């Protein structure tokens, strides 16, 4: 049936096209030059089978009208020739949001926000001898915790070749003295070279309107490194190192308020001070420096005594007013008149003393 249908279409084309009929009557009976276009025409004829028909030909006309019109861009148009208003209207038509401006700001992390893996000072440190049982026990615990610190020191040396835990104590002591000297002098610019950004507000807090006398007298024991840790911030390449140094020294401290009254300490009394000071360095930074970062205050340390200058305001309780009767009011008026007359009498005594000199010598 399909072959018969195709043959019928060929005959119809031959009847419609007179040029084809004349070519067919030529000697030889061939189609000649018109054979190839005719074959292409026959091949382009749509043949519809049962499988090619739509399964539901109900809305055939509406499906014919259904199409998507593509708005193709003009490739010959240059980006520089389009105005901002025209670009804005085109983006608004297509529902495209404008590009967001770059609002993020670069930030620099120069120090950490606290102490990571803080050192826990042994109770009674500085008071127990190494020869005693408790002192030997403290020394043994220190050796057990030393393995992590050695790994941290090795990590610090990979960034700073000149670092030595034996020589760092003297360097840390110089930083400690310089920081406290500038704090007592209230030099808020030079102190920033020796303290971190976290430590600066804690040291300079409540220093205003006060006179501070501080002096580092001597070291009772040489300062030594007791703890070292290295951590990363945000990325693995951003490394920070913290070293805890033990100071046992003699210091003098006296604090006066704005009126010159002694608030704390004394300028003639020296005290033994045991401190665990944390120093930090941004070891990833080539120009990083060791700076005072924080102090470790153990839980077993007794609380500080308050300033000796304290005031207590004692207010007298107000008595409620009493109601006076008519008789009491008259008595009170008579008493007041008598008191006024008594006050006026002594006024004449100075005059008499001038007129009549006393005989007593």
Curated annotation (Swiss-Prot):
Localization in the cell: Mitochondrion
Family per similarity comment: Belongs to the mitochondrion-specific ribosomal protein mL45 family.
Positions of region (Disordered): 319-361
Gene3D superfamilies reported for this sequence: 3.10.450.240
GO cellular component, one term: mitochondrial large ribosomal subunit
One MF term in the entry's GO annotations: structural constituent of ribosome
Gene: mRpL45
Cross-referenced SUPFAM superfamilies: NTF2-like (SSF54427)
Protein name: Large ribosomal subunit protein mL45
Coiled-coil ranges from the UniProt annotation: none
One family name in Pfam for this protein: Tim44
Species this protein is from: Drosophila melanogaster
Organism lineage string: Eukaryota, Metazoa, Ecdysozoa, Arthropoda, Hexapoda
């Amino acid at each position: 049936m399909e072959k018969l249908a195709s043959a019928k279409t060929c005959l119809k084309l031959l009847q419609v096209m007179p040029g084809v009929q004349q070519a067919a009557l030529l000697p030889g009976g061939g189609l000649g030059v018109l054979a190839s276009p005719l074959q292409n025409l026959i091949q382009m004829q749509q043949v519809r089978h049962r499988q090619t028909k739509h399964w539901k030909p109900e809305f055939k006309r509406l499906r014919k009208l259904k199409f998507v019109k593509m708005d193709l861009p003009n490739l010959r148009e240059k980006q520089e020739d389009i105005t901002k208003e025209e670009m804005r209207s085109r983006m608004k038509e297509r529902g495209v949001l404008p590009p967001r401006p770059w609002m993020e700001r670069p930030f620099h992390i120069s120090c950490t926000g606290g102490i990571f893996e803080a050192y826990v000072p042994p109770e009674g440190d500085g008071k127990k001898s190494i020869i005693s049982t408790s002192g030997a026990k403290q020394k043994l615990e220190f050796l057990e915790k030393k393995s992590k610190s050695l790994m941290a020191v090795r990590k610090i040396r990979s960034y700073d070749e000149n670092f030595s835990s034996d020589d760092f104590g003297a360097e840390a002591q110089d930083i400690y003295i310089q920081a406290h000297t500038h704090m007592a002098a209230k030099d808020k610019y030079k102190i920033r070279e020796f303290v971190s950004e976290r430590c600066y507000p804690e040291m300079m807090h409540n220093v205003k309107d006060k006179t501070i006398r501080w002096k580092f007298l001597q070291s009772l024991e040489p300062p030594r490194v007791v703890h070292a840790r290295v951590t990363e911030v945000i990325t693995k390449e951003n490394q920070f190192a913290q070293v805890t140094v033990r100071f046992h020294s003699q210091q003098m401290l006296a604090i006066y308020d704005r009126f010159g009254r002694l608030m704390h300490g004394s300028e003639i009394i020296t005290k033994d001070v045991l401190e665990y000071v944390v120093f930090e360095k941004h070891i990833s930074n080539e120009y990083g420096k060791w700076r005072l970062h924080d102090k470790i205050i153990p839980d077993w340390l007794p609380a500080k005594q308050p300033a000796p200058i304290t005031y207590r305001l004692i207010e007298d309780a107000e008595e409620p007013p009493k109601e006076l009767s008519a008789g009491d009011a008259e008595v009170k008026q008579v008493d007041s008149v008598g008191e006024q007359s008594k006050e006026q009498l002594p006024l004449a005594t100075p005059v008499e003393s001038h007129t009549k000199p006393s005989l007593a010598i």
